[in-house]
Amino acid sequence: PLAEFEQTAAAIGAGQLDRRVPQWHPRTEVGRLSLALNGMLAQIQRAVASAESSAEKARDSEDRMRQFITDASHELRTPLTTIRGFAELYRQGAARDVGMLLSRIESEASRMGLLVDDLLLLARLDAHRPLELCRVDLLALASDAAHDARAMDPKRRITLEVLDGPGTPEVLGDESRLRQVLRNLVANAIQHTPESADVTVRVGTEGDDAILEVADDGPGMSQEDALRVFERFYRADSSRARASGGTGLGLSIVDSLVAAHGGAVTVTTALGEGCCFRVSLPRVSDVDQLSLTPVVPGPP
């Protein structure tokens, strides 16, 4: 038995952590020793696997953060360069229309402020800061979102539909953040479709979930773009977000906020057939009532 123990120990020392010593009768000293050693080896293997997994996650997180900082720096550089250029024209007295020049500077500064706000929100979500939770009626939020969208684009046909389903679309969530989810989805539909494209906001229930949908009959997206549309700073058209005043983070924020609420967001689309963004959230009736105590988030 000792020779077999020695061979197993050598194999483990060489990195074969799945090796075990032979089992002997548990009533013998050798049997009890083999049982104890195998238990210890199993714990070591689990600990090493956990450490490797944590290290891999840390590397992935570091890579994502590095890419995020690179993208953010690039996006911030664009409005800064524009502001600097117009400011230099003003300093040199080369601009004929000073009002237009100052308006462009103000516009770029405003866009940069929106970008910084979006970046700070994503940083909070990445850090898993707690949300301020309460009961939220999604029907009321959807109605407000449709009303606001009509005010934003009065020429467009924007409708609200209630989906058939059991119960009410009430969830446990942060009302201001859920309003932002709807606001971003509706703004995305309006900004990236022609005025002739209808936009429909739907709300209801499906099984244990509350459902929100924002659909349009615009040009749609390719499946390749649909797979990446929730990535940060990803644009199906590299010029479209800048042309419409967006930051390229709206759908990423939707994805992160929905995930923070324990839900999921998907998109159904095809070229020439419009887009339908669908948000599924757990209904409040299925949440432990003890968890309804509001959680106040810490400072950013």
Where do the PLM segments sit?
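Conserved micro-motifs of the catalytic ATP-binding
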Residues: 127-132, 170-173
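A conserved beta-strand-to-alpha-helix junction within the catalytic ATP-binding
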Residues: 27, 31, 132-147
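HAMP signal relay modules and closely related sensory coiled-coil linkers
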Residues: 1-11, 24-39
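Short alpha-helical segment of the dimerization/phosphotransfer core of two-component systems
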Residues: 107-112
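Short conserved segment of the HATPase_c
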Residues: 221-233
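Conserved glycine-rich
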Residues: 262-263
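Short beta-strand/loop element within the Bergerat-fold HATPase_c
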Residues: 196-208
